Amino acid sequence: MNADNPSVPGAAASRPWWKVVLLLLGGFLLFMLLYGLLQSAFFLTDGRSVLNVAAGFICGAAILAVYSLMVRLFERRRPADMPARRFLPDIGGGFLLSIVYFAAVTAIIALLGCYAIDSVSFNASVFFPKLAFFFLVACGEEVIFRGVFFRIIDEKWGTAAALAVSALLFGLFHIFNPGATLWSSVAIAIEAGLLLGAAYKFSGNLWLPIGIHWGWNLMEGPVLGFAVSGNGMAPGEAVCLSTVSGPDIISGGAFGLEASIFAAVIGLAIAAWFVHRTARR
């Protein structure tokens, strides 16, 4: 992970507030539309695993390319949050962090008797398309919530406002998912909204939060067998065929591990560490 966070003045800092709001709304609508279209394109390749994998990574890269182009066109500068030299180290570091994070949460709820692995099997034709799909999801959602909302609000109104607003919006974004509750949205805002925003500020780039988000979804669903933000794994889709039981506040219930109190507490602790390290610089 990179601890460098170059302070590069953005176009939003010198613009009137109403123009910044228009920039936020325009960016949100553009990338939500693009994200939806690219997800549809990905699902058109279902059943053809090699093409499916390629489609996931190509669609994820397409979102990043359009983001880079939009920054150049509308802000008249290179995107400072996409340094090529940090791509592999920070995506890899974020991915590894998520594996450790979700392994720790799963171990806790397993010790409490709320999670058990019944059997283990690996199907490459199912796993690798999921790997590619969640790369697309990570790229799309991180561009929208960190590249657009967090970055622009941070440039105009400061980091505290950027963390609060982007986390709140990220929680609201998931409130209509299957199995969602008010608590699951609050938990997502805490453990993902704050954590991913703090990781973006700490690293100064999109790669670290993309890596965290990517590894998070992959570990939660296709590896451990939990629902991912309410979207359950069908039999045979996850490496671990598991049984989840007990109180929803512990296990996460139908929404998945993200709605566990332990995921929220540990995620908040990691976010606080990123904020502390950033503030020390």
Predicted regions and their residues:
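N-terminal, membrane-interfacial amphipathic/helix-forming hydrophobic leader that caps
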Residues: M1-R78, G221-R281
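Juxtamembrane helix-loop-helix connectors linking adjacent transmembrane helices
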Residues: V8, L37-A55, R72-V143, F150-E155
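Membrane-interface helix/loop boundary segments of multi-pass membrane proteins
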Residues: G10-A11, G140-V165, L169, A198-N205
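Hydrophobic alpha-helical transmembrane segments
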Residues: V21-L25, A54, I91-L96, F127-F128, ...
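Small-polar-interrupted transmembrane alpha-helices in polytopic inner-membrane proteins
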Residues: A103, F134, A138, G158-I175, ...
